[in-house]
């Protein structure tokens, strides 16, 4: 095996920071050694097996909690009328640990319980930090822990899929995945949505909002119980059945995991758990997120790192999760959370503004995940562009497999919002879509859930606006909708075809789902109208949504069958005057004419020799185009010219209709 080069060797601009990079690496290596048992980090991370409620070998119950500021802790619940009693008092074990052992008959499947924690000067009800099941009372809205011990444990039937070097990700939210105005379930998703994902050809499911969160409208980002699967979507067995069904179809399941902060709630969450504000969090202002109103973890504490690392291990062990998208990584990495600042140079990544404790934790998390399952993968959501974040740890990086290419979606919005079609720059589009570090892998997307949220707009809605409500019928004649349909397909195709190493689509955007996402809240009368997916729009032949879906399926199929992400895109033509962008990738040529009015006959450009066949065009009638191109058209480039080169000037000539993209494959 060839020696792995350090990131400052592959990027000379990082050489001034060699000492910092090496120091980080050594520090993290030392932490790994301290947390490991032998050479195994996995063997050393087991807090979830010690704390919380578990069975003992003699079939009793044991419950443990870490609360160093507590003076007394009681188990309260249906079994003792929710009253503190000595029979249910935990005994101190030292080092802040507390324990109680109960006979089998005291607790059973479905029993509701909480903790009552007393501390100097006060006390309150709390949910266990390592609780794995919580339920909400429909009347009081209060959450309780629930004993979960079904008579028959779930039996896994299917093996996890293999490695995903180039994931094609379908981002989804279980609760808003149904058509009815209510919270949808795991079982409904497995039955109704998973087959759609498989039919489209996506090979990875990225699921949001799995960790329990008190406020549904937070989109799952205000987590209270990190080990608890959100019960509003169903039972643990129903989620396992969903994961199992995805694996049966060869689809990996990635979890959107929130380790960047915790909800400020005290009754449900970790805030002031034992009366101290800094149990798992930073003390003072640093422990409170100024923009999110939540608590910020102190990643320098061993207890915090053990808690979060155990959380990763738990989800992989218990639910066979194949990987994680780490949310809010920028907020974790910087003391100011990256708020209202521009990242303009490498100094931003290697100076006092970085929370090195967070870097340590993220590197350890990646090591743990990789040791548990070498085929698992991780994705970082980071807007700062920190160098090395998605580089291997051995190379001096943090170890993520991929980073989200977040600037691409922002740029599409900017171009649509601020420029006329005639002002679009082919050079700018090419640069923004392909600009990435050579040593790091990226996931590209034209839009994700962020662009669909209330207050923002999806691409299709920006392109069509109010005419989406009146002119999406096939018989309607609307230049605005025609433009929107054409650009929606072109934008997605060019984004996928230039993607660094993977591609993401948010649920429903493949067919141009109308309107925005707005979860039930006081401001909208607690309505679910905009917190659902109207799948039926993509079914009738008389609506144009169906044809956008058909194109997305064909596009994903092309990317997989041609293996385009195995190669690096190569620019062939960047024609600013005519608004034409042409590039090659793997065995394909992608030619896009963004010109709003002009079509070009016999547009010539240099291309590799061989026979080229048209395999996909956005203008096809089956994709609601105008049918101006002939499917399966063949073009031939001679093998060599007089000078022996395998390219000719103006050697391939195409008809490029306005607002159209075509994919050619070399036979």
Residue spans of the language-model regions?
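Conserved alpha/beta catalytic core and glycan-binding cleft of carbohydrate-active enzymes
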Residues: 136, 320-322, 340-529, 560-608, ...
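Substrate-binding/active-site clefts of carbohydrate-active enzymes
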Residues: 135, 152-164, 169, 173-354, ...
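Flexible loop/turn segments at secondary-structure boundaries
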Residues: 213-215, 260-265, 325, 331-335, ...
């Amino acid at each position: 095996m060839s020696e792995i080069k350090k990131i400052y060797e592959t990027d000379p601009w990082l050489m001034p920071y060699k000492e910092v990079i090496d120091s980080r690496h050594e520090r993290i290596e030392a932490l790994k050694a301290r947390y490991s048992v032998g050479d195994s980090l996995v063997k050393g991370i087991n807090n979830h097996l010690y704390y919380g409620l578990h069975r003992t070998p003699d079939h009793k119950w044991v419950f443990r909690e870490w609360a160093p500021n507590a003076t007394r802790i009681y188990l309260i619940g249906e079994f003792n009328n929710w009253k503190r009693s000595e029979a249910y008092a935990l005994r101190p074990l030292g080092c802040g640990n507390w324990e109680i052992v109960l006979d089998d008959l005291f607790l059973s499947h479905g029993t509701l319980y909480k903790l009552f924690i007393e501390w100097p000067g006060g006390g309150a009800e709390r949910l266990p930090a390592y609780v794995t099941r919580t339920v909400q009372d429909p009347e009081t809205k209060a959450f309780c822990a629930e004993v979960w011990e079904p008579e028959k444990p779930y039996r896994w039937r299917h093996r996890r899929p293999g490695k995903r070097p180039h994931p094609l990700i379908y981002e989804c939210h279980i609760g808003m995945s149904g058509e009815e105005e209510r919270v949808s379930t795991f079982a409904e998703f497995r039955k109704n949505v998973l087959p759609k994902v498989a039919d489209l050809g996506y090979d990875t499911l990225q699921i949001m909002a799995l960790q329990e969160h008190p406020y549904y409208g937070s989109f799952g980002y205000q987590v209270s119980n990190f080990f608890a699967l959100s019960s509003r979507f169903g039972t643990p067995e129903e989620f396992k059945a969903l994961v199992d069904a995805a694996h049966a179809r060869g689809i990996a399941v990635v979890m959107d995991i929130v380790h960047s902060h915790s909800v400020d709630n005290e009754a449900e969450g970790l805030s002031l758990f034992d009366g101290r504000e800094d149990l798992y969090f930073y003390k003072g202002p640093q422990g409170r997120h100024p923009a999110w109103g939540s608590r910020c973890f102190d990643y320098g504490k061993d207890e915090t790192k053990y808690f979060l690392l155990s959380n990763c291990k738990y989800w992989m062990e218990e639910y066979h999760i194949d990987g994680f998208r780490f949310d809010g990584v920028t907020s974790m990495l910087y003391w100011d959370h990256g708020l209202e600042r521009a990242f303009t140079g490498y100094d931003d990544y290697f100076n006092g503004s970085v929370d090195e404790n967070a870097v340590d934790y993220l590197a350890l998390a990646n090591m743990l995940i990789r040791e548990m399952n070498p085929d698992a993968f991780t994705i970082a959501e980071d807007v700062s562009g920190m160098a090395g974040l998605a580089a291997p740890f051995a190379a001096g990086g943090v170890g993520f497999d991929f980073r989200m290419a977040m600037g691409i979606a922002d740029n599409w919005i900017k171009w649509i919002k601020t420029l006329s079609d005639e002002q679009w720059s082919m050079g700018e589009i090419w640069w923004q879509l392909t600009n990435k570090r050579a040593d790091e892998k990226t996931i590209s997307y034209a839009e994700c859930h962020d662009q669909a949220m209330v207050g923002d707009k999806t691409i299709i809605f920006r392109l069509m606006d109010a005419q989406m409500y009146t002119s999406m019928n096939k018989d309607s004649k609307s230049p605005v909708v025609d433009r929107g349909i054409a650009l929606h397909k072109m934008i997605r195709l060019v984004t996928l075809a230039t993607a660094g190493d993977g591609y993401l689509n948010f649920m429903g955007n493949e067919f141009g789902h109308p309107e925005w996402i707005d979860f039930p809240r006081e401001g909208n009368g607690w309505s679910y109208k905009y917190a659902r997916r109207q799948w039926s729009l993509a079914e009738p032949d008389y609506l144009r949504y169906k044809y956008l879906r058909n194109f997305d399926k064909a596009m994903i199929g092309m990317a997989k069958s041609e293996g385009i992400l195995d190669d690096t895109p190569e620019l062939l033509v960047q024609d600013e005057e005519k608004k034409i962008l042409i590039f090659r990738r793997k065995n394909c040529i992608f030619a896009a004419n963004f010109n709003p009015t002009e079509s070009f006959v016999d547009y010539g450009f240099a291309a590799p020799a061989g026979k080229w066949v048209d395999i996909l065009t956005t203008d096809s009638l089956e994709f609601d185009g105008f049918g101006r191109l002939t499917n399966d058209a063949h073009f031939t480039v001679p093998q060599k010219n007089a000078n022996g080169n395998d390219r000719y000037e103006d050697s391939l000539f195409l008809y490029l209709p306005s607002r159209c993209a075509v994919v050619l494959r070399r036979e």
